[in-house]
From Swiss-Prot:
Disulphide bridges, residue numbers: 112-187
TM region positions: 39-63, 75-97, 114-135, 155-175, 203-225, 275-293, 309-331
Sites carrying sugar chains: 8, 26
GO biological process: cellular response to hormone stimulus; digestive tract development; eating behavior; ERK1 and ERK2 cascade; estrous cycle; female pregnancy; G protein-coupled receptor signaling pathway; heart development
Compartments, record wording: Cell membrane
Organism whose genome encodes this protein: Rattus norvegicus
Biased composition (Low complexity): 365-388
Gene Ontology CC: adherens junction; apical plasma membrane; microvillus; plasma membrane
PANTHER family: NEUROPEPTIDE RECEPTOR-RELATED G-PROTEIN COUPLED RECEPTOR, OXYTOCIN RECEPTOR
Chain ranges on the Extracellular side, renumbered to this chain: 1-38, 98-113, 176-202, 294-308
Protein family: Belongs to the G-protein coupled receptor 1 family. Vasopressin/oxytocin receptor subfamily.
Membrane topology: Multi-pass membrane protein
Protein known as: Oxytocin receptor
Ranges of the Cytoplasmic topological domain: 64-74, 136-154, 226-274, 332-388
Amino acid sequence: MEGTPAANWSVELDLGSGVPPGEEGNRTAGPPQRNEALARVEVAVLCLILFLALSGNACVLLALRTTRHKHSRLFFFMKHLSIADLVVAVFQVLPQLLWDITFRFYGPDLLCRLVKYLQVVGMFASTYLLLLMSLDRCLAICQPLRSLRRRTDRLAVLGTWLGCLVASAPQVHIFSLREVADGVFDCWAVFIQPWGPKAYVTWITLAVYIVPVIVLAACYGLISFKIWQNLRLKTAAAAAAAEGNDAAGGAGRAALARVSSVKLISKAKIRTVKMTFIIVLAFIVCWTPFFFVQMWSVWDVNAPKEASAFIIAMLLASLNSCCNPWIYMLFTGHLFHELVQRFFCCSARYLKGSRPGETSVSKKSNSSTFVLSRRSSSQRSCSQPSSA
């Protein structure tokens, strides 16, 4: 894949061999060329992805910070998933955007290794935090009495981040600043054995995509079965309650109690399960083309590695970091409603306090009153009760 910007993308390698292109016999006479039209399309797409990912996830974090329900377990996982998406945007999308603009990596060897390391950290973190949130929803539905406690949540998230940092370590050893043509240097992967690219890309695909998807499918299979059981119980209990007679009055009352219990489960948790399921679906849709072309390129020597569709497919993975904030907004719209209300409320108070013609004494008095009463009055006027 020498000469294509996609060669710089995350775990994408010089897939033709296990050595840098400059060491495959004779060096090329000059630096390879690229498709400039395709490069401009890549730059435009990456600019859009970067803007949407940064703005969307920043709004999510701000909304979670200002909500009165910030200690919710679901919101805790949403916060860390948004942080992981920001890591993807800053350390994966942004370097790739700069790389597409400059065509070659311009920087020291240490920066090359660091960028490659952080690119994969974002991939691992986004995947495994989503997996952790899905496991939490599975426990909440299937075994509510054994669901994770707050201390366990924090330890699980901390362990996930540490595991992602460790799992990404091979990038530091594999990538380095190499001479890819006469006088031309780039951040490139080097393998000792010719089967190295196959082994490494296959491992990344298993660790970041195949194994998590299998676990996610098992989680939502269990969740679906439990919900089906509850709905069936609810229907049967409602029928038994409707048939209540004098002889079965106690059974009818018990059935009504069971109906009420099922309703509580549905209202409190089904919506969060739906949200997590849509996030998982977006993850699969966005990452499948990326890993498909990665595996194709290492296992098929005749793969069209420089084709436009091949390269664009690798850009789709980052769309996942753009989709998640919109999914949050769809299912927890009250978060953004509160954020907008607080913004307009604070803006109105600022404008009111900045009216011309007021004396300095009155300004000082108004400012002091605002500071003292901000916590109580602004919360009463600017925030709405959550519907979660």
